[in-house]
C-alpha cells in the first residue's frame, strides 16, 4: 500500500516537472512506470515494453547527485493504442520486480499572478468601518461596479477585509500604486485581487511556515535543556542552589522565567502552562531523589558536608589537593561548587569573582557549616 502511495506521489511531483503551458503537451502515448528495480536501465525498459509497440522514448529517472535510479521512469509509444495493450496485460515483471505502468498525465501549470484586473483587495479595515465607508472613499479614484466586505457567519461581523471592483483597470493601477490608504483613521492595504488558484499555494506555504514558527515557540517555551547537560543538575539549580557566574535555568528562553525555583510562563498559553507544570514536578522529584536543593536545617547541612567526597583517586605522583580546605591558597577569590552529579564526577570550579552580597554570603556560610 505504501509503495503505491509513493508511486502516485512520484508521478504527481516529478512526472513532467515545472513547465509552462506551452511545454505541457498531452501525449496520449506516454506512460509512467513505477516500482522499477535499481538495476533497470533505459535499454531494458525499452526492450520489455517494446513488445507492445514501437517506442519513441524510454527513460529512467535518476537522482542528480548520486546518479542512482529513483525507481521509476517513462515510456512513450509512437502509437497511443499501445498504451491500452500494456494496461490490459495485467501484471508486469521487469528485472525480477513487479512494475506498475500507468497513463502519464501532464502536470498542470501553476497559474500566474494577475497583473491587469478591475478588482482590488482591501485589508486591515477597522471594526466600525461599513461598506458605505469603503465605497465613499474609493469613489474618488473612479466609478465602482461592486464592493463587498467578508463577514464571519458566527459573529455576523466583517473580518477586516473586502473587495472593490472598478470599471477600469487603470483605476486599479492608480489605487495600488499608493498601496496604503487611510479609511476611518486607520491605514488599510490595497492590492490587486488574485484568483483562488493563485492564492491557494501561497496561503498553504504561509500556513506551513506559521505552523513551524508555533512549533519552535512551543519547544523553546518549554525550556529545552542544552545538549550534554544532565537534567538533574538543572533541577538542583532550579531548587535554589545557584552560584554566581553559573548560567541560570531559563535565561536563554524568553517565554519562561525562573521565580523562587519554579518555572513560570510569560504568557497564559494553556499548553505552555501545562508543560511547565510537568517540568516543575519533574525537577522537584529529581532534586529530592539526588538530595539537591537547600538543606532543611544547619545540622542537615553539616551532615551533608561531613559525608561530602572530594576528587576521585588519581595516579599522579603529585600531592593530592584538598579543594575544600580553607587553608588552600588557590581557592581565594573563586567559588567552589560541587558537581550536581553523584560522587563519581570531579569538582566544577567557577572562575567568576565572589559575589559579596549579604544574601549570598549567608547562603554560602550556611552551606559550609
UniProtKB/Swiss-Prot annotation:
One of its GO terms (molecular function) is mRNA binding. One of its GO terms (cellular component) is cytoplasm. Residues 29-108, 118-195 form the RRM domain. Residues 298-310 have a biased composition (Low complexity). Its main location: cytoplasm. Gene3D superfamilies: 3.30.70.330. It is found in: Cytoplasm. Keywords: Cytoplasm, Repeat, RNA-binding. One of its GO terms (biological process) is stem cell development. It comes from the Eukaryota. CDD domains: RRM1_MSI, RRM2_MSI. RNA binding protein that regulates the expression of target mRNAs at the translation level. May play a role in the proliferation and maintenance of stem cells in the central nervous system. Belongs to the Musashi family. This is RNA-binding protein Musashi homolog Rbp6. It comes from Drosophila melanogaster. The gene is Rbp6.
Amino acid at each position: 500500500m505504501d509503495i503505491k502511495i509513493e508511486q502516485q506521489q512520484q508521478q504527481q511531483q516529478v512526472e513532467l516537472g515545472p513547465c509552462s503551458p506551452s511545454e505541457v503537451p498531452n501525449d496520449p502515448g506516454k506512460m509512467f512506470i513505477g516500482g522499477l528495480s535499481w538495476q533497470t536501465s533505459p535499454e531494458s525498459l525499452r526492450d520489455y515494453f517494446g513488445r507492445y509497440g514501437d517506442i519513441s522514448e524510454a527513460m529512467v529517472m535518476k537522482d542528480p547527485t548520486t546518479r542512482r535510479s529513483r525507481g521509476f521512469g517513462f515510456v512513450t509509444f509512437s502509437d497511443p493504442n499501445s498504451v491500452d495493450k500494456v494496461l490490459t496485460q495485467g501484471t508486469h515483471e521487469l528485472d525480477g520486480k513487479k512494475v506498475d505502468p500507468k497513463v502519464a498525465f501532464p502536470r498542470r501549470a501553476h497559474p500566474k499572478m494577475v497583473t491587469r484586473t478591475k478588482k482590488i483587495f482591501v485589508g486591515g479595515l477597522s471594526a466600525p468601518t461599513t461598506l458605505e465607508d469603503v465605497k465613499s472613499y474609493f469613489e474618488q479614484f473612479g466609478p465602482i461596479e461592486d464592493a463587498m466586505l467578508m463577514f464571519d457567519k458566527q459573529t455576523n461581523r466583517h473580518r477586516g477585509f473586502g473587495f472593490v471592483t472598478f470599471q477600469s483597470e487603470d483605476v486599479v493601477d492608480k489605487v495600488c500604486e499608493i498601496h496604503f490608504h487611510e479609511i476611518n483613521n486607520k491605514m488599510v492595504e490595497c492590492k490587486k485581487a488574485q484568483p483562488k488558484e493563485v492564492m491557494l499555494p501561497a496561503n498553504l506555504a504561509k500556513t506551513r511556515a506559521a505552523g513551524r514558527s508555533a512549533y519552535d515557540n512551543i519547544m523553546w517555551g518549554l525550556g529545552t535543556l542544552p545538549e550534554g547537560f544532565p537534567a538533574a543538575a538543572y533541577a538542583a539549580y532550579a531548587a535554589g542552589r545557584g552560584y554566581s557566574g553559573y548560567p541560570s535555568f531559563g535565561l536563554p528562553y524568553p517565554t519562561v522565567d525562573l521565580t523562587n525555583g519554579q518555572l513560570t510562563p510569560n504568557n497564559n498559553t494553556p499548553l505552555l502552562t501545562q508543560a511547565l507544570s510537568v517540568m516543575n514536578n519533574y525537577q522537584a522529584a529529581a532534586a529530592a531523589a539526588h538530595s539537591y536543593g537547600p538543606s532543611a536545617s544547619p545540622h542537615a547541612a553539616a551532615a551533608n558536608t561531613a559525608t561530602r567526597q572530594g576528587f576521585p583517586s588519581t595516579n599522579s605522583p603529585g600531592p593530592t589537593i584538598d579543594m575544600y580546605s580553607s587553608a588552600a591558597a588557590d581557592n581565594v577569590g573563586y567559588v567552589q561548587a560541587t558537581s550536581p552529579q553523584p560522587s563519581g564526577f570531579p569538582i566544577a570550579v567557577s572562575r567568576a569573582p565572589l559575589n559579596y552580597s549579604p544574601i549570598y554570603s549567608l547562603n554560602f556560610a550556611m552551606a559550609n557549616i
